[in-house]
A protein has these predicted regions:
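A short, N-terminal "cap"/entry segment at the start of jelly-roll beta-barrel domains
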Residues: 1-31, 36
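Conserved short histidine dyad/triad with adjacent acidic residue
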Residues: 27-50, 64, 83-85
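Glycine- and acidic-residue-biased ligand/ion/polar-headgroup-sensing regions
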Residues: 50-68
Length: 107
């Protein structure tokens, strides 16, 4: 029988990544990384890339990536797939919460 892991994110403490950016690590094991990322209005996550694919699901607010169609806005329910090696960053005018899924291998 498999053990089902669960986390109540409402009971977790947000960890500061950089000014205006916080995270809750949901899963971090070799080859597995699941993170809730909360970005304050007017703030952003620095440009970066990964040697593996990176996936983003927008849960709340407006997520903007200046590298996608010149800064396209993505609302709740939007899904983005970044192929391995793709540089990207995140900004928001409203504040946003996203779920990030990757293999935790920085480029």
């Amino acid at each position: 029988m498999s053990l089902i892991e669960h986390i109540d994110s409402a009971q977790q403490t947000w960890e500061t990544v950089t000014e205006g950016v916080e995270k809750i690590v949901l899963r971090s094991k070799p080859g597995e990384n699941r993170v809730l990322l909360r970005i304050a209005a007017g703030k952003g996550y620095p440009k970066h890339g990964h040697s593996v694919p990176d996936e983003v699901f927008v849960m709340e607010g407006i997520y903007i990536d200046p590298f996608v169609e010149g800064g396209k806005e993505f609302g709740p329910g939007s899904y983005l797939y970044y192929p391995a090696g793709t540089e990207h960053n995140a900004t928001t005018s409203t504040g946003c919460t996203i779920l990030v899924w990757n293999s935790n291998v920085p480029k």
